[in-house]
């Protein structure tokens, strides 16, 4: 059996794969307190809401059968995306509709799609990258690019606080967004350090991205 480049890349050992395998093995060996890996805590109040909703689905005629047996819109369940748009508009003052929302099978799938939409070879022959304006970043991003050299990053400015604490910031003096950059990506809070970009930093990034678009 001969694999394509895609097949070799996605069947190879990856950082996020090792991390999730380690977490899975740890959970299988007994009670553990999950502090990362996407499972930070079981919150009884939230689980109670989910349980109540699941019970309501099971009791409603045809609802369970529809979920397990009917295809939804590729964008996501229409009723759910409409409800989610209303929630965002009501709670955050946004002005979006269902057409602005797409559902995926988790964040890895979402970022795989986004990264490869904006990075790689374009129709004009130009190769563009995803820029992380702050590093270190989430290990799970590393293997999501279909092409080599999908990502580039900028070293941070480090602010030393009272020992032993420090905080790192975007080095805007060195940040350049030219035609080789397809998109910016930041985690807030940053994984794995928990560093949070300030509102001012986010606004500056947004302005720079608009200028470069």
Whereabouts are the PLM-identified features?
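N-terminal "arm"/small-domain region of PLP-dependent enzymes with the aminotransferase-like
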Residues: 1-76, 86, 90, 179-180
């Amino acid at each position: 059996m001969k694999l394509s480049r895609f097949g070799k890349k996605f069947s190879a050992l990856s950082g996020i794969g090792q991390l999730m395998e380690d977490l899975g093995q740890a959970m299988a060996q007994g009670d553990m307190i999950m502090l990362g890996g996407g499972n930070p805590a079981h919150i009884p109040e939230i689980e109670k809401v989910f349980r109540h909703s699941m019970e309501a689905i099971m009791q409603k005629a045809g609802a369970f059968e529809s979920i397990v047996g009917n295809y939804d819109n590729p964008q996501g369940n229409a009723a759910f995306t409409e409800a989610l748009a209303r929630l965002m508009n009501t709670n955050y003052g946004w002005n979006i509709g269902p057409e602005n929302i797409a559902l995926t099978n988790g964040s890895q799938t979402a970022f795989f799609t986004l990264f490869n939409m904006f990075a790689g070879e374009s129709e004009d022959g130009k190769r563009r990258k995803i820029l992380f304006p702050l590093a270190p970043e989430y290990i799970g991003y590393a293997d999501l690019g279909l092409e080599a050299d999908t990502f580039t990053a900028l070293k941070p400015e480090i602010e030393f606080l009272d020992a032993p604490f420090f905080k790192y910031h975007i080095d805007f003096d060195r940040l350049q967004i030219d035609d080789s950059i397809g998109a910016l990506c930041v985690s807030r809070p940053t994984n794995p350090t928990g560093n949070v970009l300030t509102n001012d930093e986010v606004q500056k990034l947004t302005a720079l991205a608009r200028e470069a678009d």
